[in-house]
Amino acid sequence: MDYFPIFCQLQHKACLLVGGGEIAERKARLLLDAGALVTVNACEFTPQFHHWADQGQLSLISGEFVPELLADKWLVIAATDQLSVNALVYQSANQQRIFCNVVDDPKRTSFIMPSIIDRSPIMIAVSSGGKAPVLARLLREKLEALLPQHLGQLAGNLRQRVKQHFTVMTERRRFWEKLLTHDRLAQSLANNDHVQADQHVEQLFSAPLTDRGEVVLVGAGPGDAGLLTLKGLQQIQQADVVVYDRLVSDEVMNLVRRDAERIFVGKQSGHHCVPQEQINQILLQQAQSGKRVVRLKGGDPFIFGRGGEELEELAGYGIPFSVVPGITAASGCSAYSGIPLTHRDHAQSVRLVTGHAKKEGQLDWANLAAEKQTLVFYMGLSQAGEIQQQLIQHGMPATTQVALVENGTSRHQRVVSGELSQLALLSQQVSSPSLIIVGSVVSLREKLNWFSSRHHDDQPKVTECVAHVG
């Protein structure tokens, strides 16, 4: 984080603006809107500055900038076209520990002025730190279109009434969520139809807020937070409680609503930190207490995630539930490794297989060893030797290509590859969570490996290893 986002209360605070042109004029409008006591210093001023001065809205000081003008000022903005003047303003402000913004000069700036969406009392600031101004502008435009003009004012007017009407914090939050996502209310505000808007508000106050809890099963995807679905993001930002496991990345957890309770039930193959039965009970108890619970699972909750078992338990007690699918590890890891799971010349089908089946004969190895298909083993590291032995024993060529993807789709992704006869050895080079991909499609990785070929200064390089038969 290059800049600490902060909102300043500038009402009746003395601020200095150096510059009298059109750019300075835009900065002056912002300071005046914030209620600041504005002094403008320049050799020449636009007519608008003279108009403001005549109206008593700001003060003008004609002449060259001198450091003494900074006395008793809270902040200063330099908006001249003279680099030497801007540099002097910045240097003088720095010496006096006064925040200074030099327009279009990030190196001589101790604070930045973001794009602003004003829905007072709701204020939204968007900034790229000067590195992507077009992106910041596009985001502002989208937010401007998304938020009705009078929404913030309506929320401010209702605040005290909501506080009195709903004594429980969770009830207040749910009321606000309903109000702020009410499409017809938003349309009424956009149309300036305040009578209709008031009717929608009254309906929300009179509608019962159920105390009945619910559970939403959300797939967090394989690691990269950008692969979390929009609906998944909405759910984790509305949750009272988030129950999550170790396969959910820190980047995804950073998107969870800050005041939501977080319950870690991490587990891994062969070692259950929290027994499945206890996880079921946690979900049940939290929902029965009237909370909105998100069960957040890595990948997709219905693919080797035991999501079905958890929902069966909830269904038995009549707890409402829903499911938000996620990108499963097989899809994410293969895509980020440049390995297509199907290909007309290599594989006409793909099989997702659990790698820690413990009962002898549980897997149909003869079928798995068939040609023209791709195998993806989940949780298979500890059984890599068994997988290698069984597939070769049932007819799969020992030279079949394999790849192991560790921490797939994350910046720490590692891929090791080789032949089936080396699988047990390769498994010792990676750690969990890892995915095993078996099939001739792995040979396409060298051609299609887009992710590790990208070099980012702020990201560790993705590691690629290839084992060769001696």
Swiss-Prot record:
InterPro entries in the record: 4pyrrol_Mease (IPR000878), 4pyrrol_Methylase_sf (IPR035996), 4pyrrole_Mease_sub1 (IPR014777), 4pyrrole_Mease_sub2 (IPR014776), CobA/CysG_C (IPR006366), NAD(P)-bd_dom_sf (IPR036291), Siro_Cobalamin_biosynth (IPR050161), Sirohaem_synt_dimer_dom_sf (IPR037115)
Keyword Transferase: yes
A biological-process GO annotation: methylation
Leader sequence segment: none
Keyword Metal-binding attached: no
Listed CDD domains: SUMT
Annotated active site: D245, K267
Coiled-coil regions, chain positions: none
Annotated metabolic or biological route of this protein: Cofactor biosynthesis; adenosylcobalamin biosynthesis; precorrin-2 from uroporphyrinogen III: step 1/1; Cofactor biosynthesis; adenosylcobalamin biosynthesis; sirohydrochlorin from precorrin-2: step 1/1; Porphyrin-containing compound metabolism; siroheme biosynthesis; precorrin-2 from uroporphyrinogen III: step 1/1; Porphyrin-containing compound metabolism; siroheme biosynthesis; siroheme from sirohydrochlorin: step 1/1
Pfam families, sorted: CysG_dimeriser (PF10414), NAD_binding_7 (PF13241), Sirohm_synth_M (PF14824), TP_methylase (PF00590)
Region (Uroporphyrinogen-III C-methyltransferase): 213-470
Region of interest (Precorrin-2 dehydrogenase /sirohydrochlorin ferrochelatase), residue spans: 1-201
One MF annotation (Gene Ontology) recorded for this entry: NAD binding
Residues binding S-adenosyl-L-methionine: P222, G298, G299, D300, I303, T328, A329, M379, G408
Ligand binding (NAD(+)): E22, I23, C43, E44
Sorted UniProt keywords: Cobalamin biosynthesis, Lyase, Methyltransferase, Multifunctional enzyme, NAD, Oxidoreductase, Phosphoprotein, Porphyrin biosynthesis, S-adenosyl-L-methionine, Transferase
Modified positions (Phosphoserine) in chain numbering: S128
Known catalytic reactions: uroporphyrinogen III + 2 S-adenosyl-L-methionine = precorrin-2 + 2 S-adenosyl-L-homocysteine + H(+); precorrin-2 + NAD(+) = sirohydrochlorin + NADH + 2 H(+); siroheme + 2 H(+) = sirohydrochlorin + Fe(2+)
EC number: 2.1.1.107, 1.3.1.76, 4.99.1.4
HAMAP family with a match to the protein in the record: Siroheme_synth (MF_01646)
Main function: Then it catalyzes the NAD-dependent ring dehydrogenation of precorrin-2 to yield sirohydrochlorin. Finally, it catalyzes the ferrochelation of sirohydrochlorin to yield siroheme.
Recorded family membership: In the N-terminal section; belongs to the precorrin-2 dehydrogenase / sirohydrochlorin ferrochelatase family.
Family matches, as NCBIfam families: cobA_cysG_Cterm, cysG_Nterm, PRK06136.1, PRK10637.1
Protein name: Siroheme synthase
Gene source species: Yersinia pestis
Designated gene of the protein: cysG
